[in-house]
Regions:
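Acidic di-acidic motifs
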Residues: 13-18, 41, 71
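Short amphipathic alpha-helix used as the core "switch/output" element in two-component signaling
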Residues: 47, 80-93
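Active-site beta3 strand of CheY-like receiver
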Residues: 53-69
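Non-catalytic signal-transmission and effector/linker regions of two-component phosphorelay proteins
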Residues: 1-11, 17-32, 61-64, 125-136
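Two-component signal transduction core modules
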Residues: 68, 122-123
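Receiver (REC) domain active-site loop signature in two-component systems and cognate sites
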Residues: 74
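Helix N-cap/capping motif at the beta->alpha junctions
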Residues: 38-51, 79
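Alpha4 helix (beta4-alpha4-beta5 surface) of REC/receiver domains from two-component response regulators
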Residues: 25, 81, 94-100, 105-122
Length: 136
């Protein structure tokens, strides 16, 4: 990893492809990471994390995203259901990955629920900005 990169990888989990594209460009412009993994569903993101653990050659932490930007309102599995499934993953994954809720939800109940979750580092309202990225 080059010296100026803060993270090896981050992951975007959002069902809105346009939001994913905008957030990808914002993260690329910030230069905070080497890799960006993008998932349009929470289920595929969980499967991705499980597969890294199964297929990793060497320490799992070499392949995992350090930050997961997670939307709340998604079909099939929402952000909070993702967090429930995330809690079932191995300690090596849970200890390495931190979750940033990146959502358009202004519901105070969502914010409180997210902040009470041990895996959630921050709660950010969309859009993602360079200023927000600097604070992570």
């Amino acid at each position: 990893m080059s010296a100026e990169k803060k993270y090896y990888a981050v992951m975007l989990v959002d069902d809105n492809e346009i939001d994913n594209l905008i957030n990808q460009k914002m993260i690329e412009a910030s230069g905070i990471c080497e890799h960006i993994f993008i998932h349009s569903g929470a289920r595929s993101a969980i499967e991705f994390l499980k597969n890294i653990e199964k297929l990793a050659k060497g320490p799992v932490s070499l392949y995992l995203p350090e930050i997961i930007f997670l939307d709340i309102d998604m079909p099939l599995m929402d952000g909070f259901q993702f967090l429930e499934e995330f809690d079932k993953l191995s300690d090596s994954i849970k200890n390495h990955c931190k979750v940033v809720m990146l959502t358009s939800s202004l519901n105070p109940q969502d914010m409180n629920k997210a902040k009470k979750n041990q895996f959630v580092l921050k709660y950010i309202n969309k859009p993602l900005t360079q200023e927000n990225l600097k604070k992570i």
